[in-house]
Amino acid sequence: GTAMVLTACATTVAGKPVSVFDDPFKVGGLQASDGPTGLRPDAEEPTREVTDTDGGKDDEIAGQSISDIETFWESVYSENFDGEFKPVRALISWDSNAYDGTFCDDTTEGLINAAFCEDDSTIGWDRGVLLPSLRQANGDMAITMVLAHEYGHAIQKMAKLNKKGTPTLVAEQQADCFAGVYLRWVAEGNSPRFTLNTGDGLNNLLATM
């Protein structure tokens, strides 16, 4: 289940590696599917507000993504880590083409990125260049995947998983792992906001990484 997969993100697990071609009709143990991918037409309302949003589609998807990611972590955090899950403090949107934005005590002019700010427990993203580029290249769920990765960094801090001096590559791969566990939850049909097929939908997300 989810707990076992999450454990694999943080520890070495026993087992035998199996080729992805072992069963051509399954992907990671899930049936190969070509159904819809993206925001559900009857998606639940977002639980988070986005600061400095322009009210556009990209910020809508980002806000829904964080709401959904937090729904997931709320349901599994205490099963896997000490303490209770606490949502990030705020969500911040900016336009990297503008000169007057700030994130994590720094200017957002030219900041084509999405990130978790440890200093104030916020997650932010560039709606001017980054999010539109992600959507155009790999679909709406590319935004969700990138933000799931950033939320993985929030989980690392919350659960105190990495000691000072942990190699950046290790922390980034662990955040990727956390994002992958969330996306599997979506692919299994558990998300009240998004769907993800294991054909082109999943392939597009892997291309985003």
Region spans (language model):
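C-terminal motif of bacterial Sec signal peptides marking the signal peptidase cleavage site
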Residues: V5-A8
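A metal-dependent hydrolase signature that marks the N-terminal structural subdomain at the beginning
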Residues: A10-F103
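Catalytic zinc-binding patch centered on the HExxH motif and its immediate surroundings
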Residues: K16-P17, D95-G124
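Active-site metal-coordination segments of metallo-dependent hydrolases
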Residues: G56-D59, L161-D176
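An active-site-proximal "capping" alpha-helix that borders the catalytic cofactor pocket
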Residues: E74, L169-W185
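Short pre-active-site segment immediately N-terminal to the catalytic Zn-binding motif
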Residues: G128-M145, K163-L169
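Catalytic Zn2+-binding segment of zinc metalloproteases
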Residues: Y151-P167, V181-A187
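Long, well-structured alpha-helical subdomains associated
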Residues: V186-M209
